[in-house]
């Protein structure tokens, strides 16, 4: 994710084999998660770039506008709910969680879940859905967590710096309570203090709407 010379940072600090080939797995289309792609492509090591089809147009629009890159340059592959991405001997499972963007996904890997911005990093910025339409995907996400193993306390590796420590499944439960409470009207909607917009919170879970309606029911 992110900006700058991503490949150099990965090569120097992450890769155990500095000459390894790379696959890029995108959780969604937003610039702060995709604008490091050209740095990776310049390495000549990228085999494939994975993204959900509902976010593909936004990705390609940004890549073409800022870097002149096409789907062929990115070696683009679509992924959807239920897919498995194989990287060497490792496998990551794809689960759709639309809301932050229409094509937001999370990746299950062993005891970890890479969530991007699908459930926020303490603050969930809802860009393309009200809570009413976000809830089914969030419930699906929780069901997938429980389906795999109720005894595993997954670490949720989120996409932003506000909280550097991993979240647990408890955070996901709090987000579910928050979304359901907003829809029912049990949890009040206020105003965000960091920038213009509307906000609601429950324990460590918060939802922020910069411009979309918060809840279709509550806006009627």
What do the PLM-derived regions correspond to, one by one?
Residues 1, 86-87, 108:
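Generic beta-strand structural signal
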Residues 9-12, 136:
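Short, contiguous clusters of charged residues that form electrostatic/catalytic patches at enzyme active sites
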Residues 11-86, 181-184:
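Active-site HxH/HxHxD metal-binding segment of metal-dependent hydrolases
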Residues 172, 179-192, 199-201:
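Metal-dependent nuclease catalytic regions and adjoining charged, substrate-binding loops involved
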Residues 2-7:
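Short, small-residue-biased leader/transition segments that mark boundaries at the very start
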Residues 190-220:
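C-terminal regulatory/interaction regions
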Residues 91-98, 102-183:
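Metallo-beta-lactamase
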Residues 1, 16, 171-174, 198, ...:
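Zn-dependent metallo-beta-lactamase
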